[in-house]
């Protein structure tokens, strides 16, 4: 039964997405959104039912191949399903946020000519993400990985007549291909070592190859397992937008706002974090890989958060917040606190989707204005959006009692107790990141909702119910889900059958027993007070003394320029690497393709054959005496050769 239910949960969004894509214009808007919403709702209900089954039987793990995709000799590549605690948790998060986005889209996209196409894309994306998290082997993981990449490309460039959207989706596609190259190499290395792509077989035999090495040069060799982990993490860096492969995510805000909530908050960008947790049996055997993961996550968490302080596009501020929070999740994975990483992934999915959709509500109310400098005073005009945005903001900064408080504090607590190399550096990075998060979050909140309305003549009102209902439904878990779930998800062994966590790194199991003890402990630490201090600083800078931010940007102009130019990563990629490869491509085209292949090989061969033919053709004059002369000359040469050969002069 579990197999059939899992298959239905996976296939339903695919079926409804295809239905909307092929027949959407014929069946109408109401039927299009109805059938796609029903598909995701069915998948969500099944996911919740599977969770109930697992809670009744904590040891329940379903791992079964559906069919053999390819068989070569003794090698078999299969498509299968792995249903365990980690899988079902991700299924619920993906389906719930997807359902909210589907409902939200009814109002947000109701006037868009691509309405049916949009519903098709988001349903197919949901299927791709479910395929990724439900896979039991690297082959299916890769298919799902690439499928979400393709759907992201289509959704970012949904408004394909908009030049900036086309550039953004191309940029996302190219940057992710760099990460995917590392992922492919990592999978290929594992296949060459183990002769299989099945998770269970690889994880069970991983410890036996810890002494195996790969010689990268005559003087340098590396553990094959470490190399595989680093390559896999390279793939995660692209999908989860870790520095320096982070530049695609802010530009992806060119797509419709619902996509920002679905792809760039709750699902696709967390795929890399999910993979790190799923691959914990491999990463736990390589301290080098864990330290590398930790350092990259730490740098991403603090550096991308700083960029959020200087952005003025409402969606880009939240996008840089997403980058920073992804860094937090990666940091937790780097100190082997996979349960804390996954817990923050889940709470973040709710409150970040809420913030993106609330931003969309503001954009709709202001007739598609996105510059926060042109906003203000919307508190009384958009009361529901205001309250839900406040809930999302408090959850994001980790205010006591909200979901983000429990997940972020658990994560930071794990880092503070870690003995992994660079954990002290990571601790200070995430601690400073708490202040930065609070600053950019309430900078955005105060500039949008407080102060004076910039244009008194503009008609501002709350959008329709289809936009407001998802905000309310997302606000509930953003506010309440932390307290009841941190105990089973983090302190207990909920993920015990999904991840490997050595007892030396499991600080939660012996330091805390329930939510109350964790709450009282956190209130005695610095994290909460740093976050609250950030709120007061933001209020002072953007409500009381609004001239100070400009003075600060002038005083610290070099640093401000560095942030405004996003550390010059875009400049480096576009004007150095892109130009270098563009020039290389043009050179290969003009000299290699045109001169060598076309002119010398293809056209040159034809030219030389023609020249030779024309010379030979001159012999065929049609005069008999010419042919007789040639016969005499040929006979003379033949006789000369016979004479010389008989005399021994010719060998």
Role assignments for model-derived ranges:
Residues 74, 487-529, 540-651:
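Aromatic-capped, Gly/Pro-kinked transmembrane alpha-helices
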Residues 38-55, 179-192, 389-397, 470-490, ...:
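Hydrophobic alpha-helical membrane-insertion segments
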Residues 10-25, 99, 237, 241, ...:
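N-terminal signal-anchor/start-transfer transmembrane helix
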Residues 17-21, 101, 305-307, 440, ...:
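Alpha-helical transmembrane segments
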Residues 76-94, 215-236, 425-434, 509-535:
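Hydrophobic alpha-helical transmembrane segments
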Residues 100-144, 150-466, 477, 483:
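Hydrophobic transmembrane alpha-helices and their helix-loop junctions in integral membrane proteins
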């Amino acid at each position: 039964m579990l197999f059939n239910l899992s298959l239905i949960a996976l296939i339903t969004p695919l079926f409804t997405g295809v239905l909307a894509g092929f027949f959407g214009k014929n069946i109408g808007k109401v039927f299009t959104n109805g059938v796609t919403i029903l598909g995701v709702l069915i998948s969500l209900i099944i996911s919740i039912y599977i969770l109930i089954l697992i809670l009744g039987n904590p040891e329940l793990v379903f791992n079964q191949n559906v069919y053999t995709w390819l068989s070569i000799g003794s090698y078999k590549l299969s498509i299968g399903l792995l249903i365990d605690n980690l899988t079902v948790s991700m299924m619920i998060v993906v389906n719930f946020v997807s359902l909210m986005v589907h409902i939200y889209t009814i109002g947000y996209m109701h006037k868009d000519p691509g309405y049916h196409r949009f519903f098709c894309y988001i349903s197919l994306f949901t299927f791709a993400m479910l395929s990724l998290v439900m896979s039991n082997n690297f082959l299916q993981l890769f298919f799902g990985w690439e499928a979400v990449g393709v759907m992201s490309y289509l959704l970012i460039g949904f408004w394909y007549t908009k030049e900036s959207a086309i550039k953004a989706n191309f940029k996302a596609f190219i940057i992710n291909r760099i990460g995917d190259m590392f992922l492919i190499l990592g999978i290929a290395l594992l296949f060459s070592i183990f002769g299989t792509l099945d998770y269970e077989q690889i994880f069970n035999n991983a410890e036996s190859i810890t002494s195996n090495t790969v010689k990268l040069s005559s003087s340098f060799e590396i553990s094959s397992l470490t190399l595989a982990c680093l390559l896999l993490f390279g793939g995660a860096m692209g999908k989860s937008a870790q520095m320096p492969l982070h530049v695609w995510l802010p530009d992806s805000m060119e797509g419709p706002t619902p996509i920002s909530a679905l792809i760039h908050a709750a699902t696709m960008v967390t795929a890399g974090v999910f993979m790190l947790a799923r691959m914990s049996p491999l990463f736990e055997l390589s301290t080098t890989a864990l330290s590398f993961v930790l350092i990259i996550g730490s740098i991403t968490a603090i550096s991308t958060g700083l960029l959020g302080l200087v952005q003025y596009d409402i969606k880009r501020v939240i996008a840089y917040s997403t980058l920073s929070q992804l860094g937090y999740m990666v940091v937790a994975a780097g100190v082997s606190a996979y349960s804390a990483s996954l817990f923050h992934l889940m709470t973040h999915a709710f409150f970040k989707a809420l913030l993106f959709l609330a931003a969309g509500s503001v954009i709709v109310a202001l007739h598609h204005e996105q510059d926060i400098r042109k906003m203000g005073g919307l508190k009384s005009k958009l009361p529901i959006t205001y309250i839900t945005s406040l809930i999302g903001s408090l959850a994001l900064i980790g205010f006591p009692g909200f979901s983000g408080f429990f997940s972020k504090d658990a994560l930071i607590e794990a880092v503070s107790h870690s003995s992994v190399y660079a954990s002290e550096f990571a601790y200070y990075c995430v601690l400073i990141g708490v202040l930065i998060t609070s600053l950019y979050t309430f900078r955005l909140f105060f500039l949008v909702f407080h102060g004076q309305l910039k244009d008194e003549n503009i008609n501002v009102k709350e959008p329709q119910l289809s936009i407001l209902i998802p905000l309310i439904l997302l606000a509930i878990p953003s506010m309440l889900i932390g307290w009841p779930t941190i105990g089973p998800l983090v302190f207990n062994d909920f993920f015990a059958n999904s991840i490997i966590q050595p007892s030396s790194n499991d600080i939660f199991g012996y330091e805390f027993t329930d939510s109350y003890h964790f709450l009282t402990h956190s209130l005695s630490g610095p994290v909460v007070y740093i976050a609250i201090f950030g709120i007061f600083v933001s209020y002072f800078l953007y409500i009381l003394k609004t001239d100070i931010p400009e003075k600060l940007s002038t005083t610290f102009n070099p640093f401000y320029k560095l942030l405004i130019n996003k550390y010059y990563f875009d400049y480096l990629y576009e004007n150095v690497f892109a130009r270098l490869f563009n020039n290389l491509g043009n050179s290969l085209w003009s000299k290699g393709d045109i001169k060598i292949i076309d002119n010398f090989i293809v056209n040159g061969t034809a030219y030389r054959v023609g020249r030779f033919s024309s010379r030979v053709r001159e012999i065929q004059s049609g005069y008999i005496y010419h042919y007789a002369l040639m016969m005499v000359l040929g006979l003379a040469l033949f006789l000369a050769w016979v004479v010389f050969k008989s005399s021994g002069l010719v060998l």
